[in-house]
Amino acid sequence: VTKSARARRAVVLACGGFPHDVARRKAMFPHAGDGTAHFSPGPVGNTGDGLRLAETAGGRIEDTLPNAAAWVPVSITERKDGSKGVMPHFIDRAKPGVIAVMRDGRRFANEGNSYHDFVQAMVKAAKPGEEITAFLLCDHRALRRYGLGCVPPFPMPLRHHLSTGYLKRGTTLAELAD
């Protein structure tokens, strides 16, 4: 069955984007370097098939937008089977007692900003050619009260997260930086 759709100006295609299409990420995100610098909590099968299908039918992807993605800060976890998990930090950075810093130890954004604005600030604060990485810092009390990322609040133990390196513990900022 053939169906037609007509539009006066544009069609918005909601097909999940292209979080796991390395070539398109490289083309659309100037800061992405080799295209592998982004981790997405989106399904790994979400490789932009819908966009490519639309392009074969004559569709055009708007590539002049200042932001071609919905950015979200994530952390990477290692699962028991050795595969990697991607943990989105939608609200973690805005929890009481949490601050975010770049590798140089400097705060770069208001942690309460939207996750999209937060990641834009993180990208802007990174030095050219440097991996875009930030760290969420909190004290023991905040961690146990609110949790952080894949670390649940008290009474769940912290051992696993400390042993895998997902959490780092130190009594000074210098210890945390090691």
Each predicted region: which residue ranges?
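A structured beta-alpha segment of the ubiquitous adenosine-cofactor-binding alpha/beta core
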Residues: 1-5
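An anion/pyrophosphate-binding glycine-rich loop and adjacent beta-alpha core
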Residues: 51-177
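Glycine-rich loop(s) and the adjacent beta-strand/alpha-helix scaffold that form part
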Residues: 6-77
